[in-house]
């Protein structure tokens, strides 16, 4: 059972100064895989063991999950793994902007909390400002991977990424959904979905060489797509 929290509440809107890679990993020079909304972090634990050539950072808005994940990390002594509590839409942009060029090489957003009602659209994890921060940090060819088992969750993410013009899908990937997970370890939610024989909707993107769109123009264009004028959408609450 997912325990939702409202990312728009005052507590979660307080920006946090996140530690630099030098404070998180034994070798901060390794490429970073950033997993946004890592939940209990078991997938990243296994990835850190399989990919010692990378540093793996999981961020999660539910503090108890972060505490448990970090406790496991310490017991396992995974020095290329760390977990941080934060609201990704409030605290990640500055952290990513401070990274050395091409340090961040993969961003994943896997099975995010399903805020699929229109009136809850501002609670979704992938907002235009976060997407632009990711696009500004990733060098051409570096990857953004998104997946969900809820079409009403994945469809807006895909629409926003493609509206930005900053990312392309690999030519060889199936449309509309990639057949498999490019990561060698499934998340806990993904395992659950697979056990039930249900579909998972996946898209892998690679940063292209297009410049970032104007943030205000992207926001306006996104509102037109995500909140058509003829839809009566009550305020968030």
Curated annotation (Swiss-Prot):
Keyword terms, alphabetized: Methyltransferase, S-adenosyl-L-methionine, Transferase, tRNA processing
Name of the molecule in the record: tRNA (guanine-N(7)-)-methyltransferase
PROSITE patterns registered for this protein in UniProt: SAM_MT_TRMB
Record flagged with keyword S-adenosyl-L-methionine: yes
Function according to Swiss-Prot or TrEMBL: Catalyzes the formation of N(7)-methylguanine at position 46 (m7G46) in tRNA.
UniProt-annotated binding residues for substrate: 117, 149
Cellular component, GO annotation: tRNA methyltransferase complex
EC numbers: 2.1.1.33
Family, similarity comment: Belongs to the class I-like SAM-binding methyltransferase superfamily. TrmB family.
Pathway the protein acts in: tRNA modification; N(7)-methylguanine-tRNA biosynthesis
PANTHER family: 3-DEOXY-D-MANNO-OCTULOSONIC-ACID TRANSFERASE/TRNA GUANINE-N 7 - -METHYLTRANSFERASE (PTHR23417), TRNA (GUANINE-N(7)-)-METHYLTRANSFERASE (PTHR23417:SF21)
Pfam families xref list: Methyltransf_4
Annotated binding of S-adenosyl-L-methionine, by residue: 35, 60, 87, 113
CDD domains on file: AdoMet_MTases
Molecular function as annotated in GO: tRNA (guanine(46)-N7)-methyltransferase activity
Active site, renumbered: 113
């Amino acid at each position: 059972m997912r325990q939702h929290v409202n990312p728009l509440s005052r507590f979660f809107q307080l920006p946090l100064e996140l530690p630099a890679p030098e404070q998180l990993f034994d070798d901060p020079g390794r490429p970073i895989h950033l997993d946004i909304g890592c939940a209990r972090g078991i997938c990243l634990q296994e990835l850190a063991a399989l990919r010692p050539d990378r540093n793996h950072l999981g961020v999660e808005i539910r503090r108890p999950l972060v505490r448990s994940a970090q406790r496991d990390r310490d017991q396992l002594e995974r020095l290329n793994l760390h977990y941080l509590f934060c609201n990704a839409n409030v605290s990640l942009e500055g952290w990513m902007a401070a990274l050395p060029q091409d340090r961040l090489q993969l961003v994943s957003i896997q099975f995010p909390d399903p805020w699929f009602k229109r009136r809850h659209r501002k609670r979704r994890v992938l907002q235009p400002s976060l997407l632009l921060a990711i696009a500004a940090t990733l060098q051409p060819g570096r990857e953004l991977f998104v997946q969900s088992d809820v079409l009403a969750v994945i469809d807006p993410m895909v629409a926003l990424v493609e509206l930005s013009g900053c990312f392309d899908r690999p030519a060889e990937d199936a449309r509309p959904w990639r057949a498999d997970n490019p990561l060698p370890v499934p998340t806990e939610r993904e395992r659950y979905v697979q056990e039930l024989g249900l579909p998972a909707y996946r898209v892998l993107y690679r940063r292209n060489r297009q410049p970032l769109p104007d943030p205000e123009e992207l926001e306006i264009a996104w509102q037109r797509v995500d909140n058509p004028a003829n839809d009566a959408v009550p305020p968030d609450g």
